Design a protein with these regions (language model features):
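ABC ATPase nucleotide-binding domains
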Residues: 1-52
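Structural detector for hydrophobic anchor residues on beta-strands
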Residues: 11, 65-70, 82, 107, ...
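C-terminal boundary and immediately downstream tail of ABC-type ATPase nucleotide-binding domains
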Residues: 49-74, 85, 152
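Short, conserved beta-turn/loop elements at beta-strand boundaries and strand-helix junctions
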Residues: 114-120
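Glycine/charge-rich catalytic "coupling/switch" loops of P-loop NTPases
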Residues: 71-114, 141-179
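Beta-strand/loop nucleic-acid-binding surfaces
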Residues: 131-141
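Residues located in well-ordered beta-strands
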Residues: 43, 55, 108-112
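Short, acidic/hydrophobic/Gly-rich beta-strand patch recurrent on exposed beta strands
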Residues: 85, 122-128, 135
């Protein structure tokens, strides 16, 4: 409603919010600040999909910070990487009896929590010492707390010296190359 009102009035507006979802919905341009310093600016899609700094990468959603991203299979090694950021939408979860596209590159995890969020289920998963959030649609078979599932991490942001490297799981990337 706010964006509609701004457009209807034909005014230029600066909207300050700490609600990331609201910022993405309303903005034509987003400026992410951290302690008075501009971290990144761009369209909502640019800022979300191509973060330029560690702060920008972890700003949206319920991103998990992973100290050793090598626990996930088939990602390029970035020597000297400090940590990785994994957003829930990067994580694909399948039950043990489900058909899965990337079974050889999936890892086993325990479902620690399942929360109904209206249009999806939010999962908290434990893979060794790593805790991840993931989403599962209402059209997918329900997973339960305590269940063992397969987890495929499709993408992650690796941080080295505040630079962000967006890495794709090579097993998924190679799948796209098949003709």
């Amino acid at each position: 409603w706010l964006k509609d009102m701004i457009e209807k009035l034909g005014i230029t507006s600066i909207f300050v919010t700490h609600d990331q979802d609201e910022a993405i919905e309303v903005a034509d341009e987003i400026i992410i600040t951290n302690r008075g310093h501009i971290e990144q600016k761009g369209s909502p899609v640019e800022v979300y999909q191509s973060p330029e700094t560690a702060f920008s990468a972890s700003f949206f959603g319920q991103a998990a910070t992973i100290r050793d991203y090598h626990v996930f299979n088939y990602f390029e090694d970035i020597p000297g990487a400090e940590y990785a950021i994994v957003r829930p939408e990067f994580v694909k979860v399948t039950r043990k009896n489900e058909v899965q596209k990337y079974k050889s590159s999936a890892s086993e995890a325990d479902v620690e929590r399942v929360a109904f969020r209206g249009s999806y289920f939010e999962l908290q998963l434990k893979l060794g010492e790593v805790v991840l959030s993931a989403r599962r649609g209402l059209d997918e078979p329900l997973v339960r707390q305590g269940e063992k599932v397969d987890v495929f991490v499709q993408r992650l942001f690796v941080i080295k010296e505040n630079k962000v490297y967006a890495l794709e799981n090579s097993s998924a990337r190679e799948d796209y190359l098949v003709i």
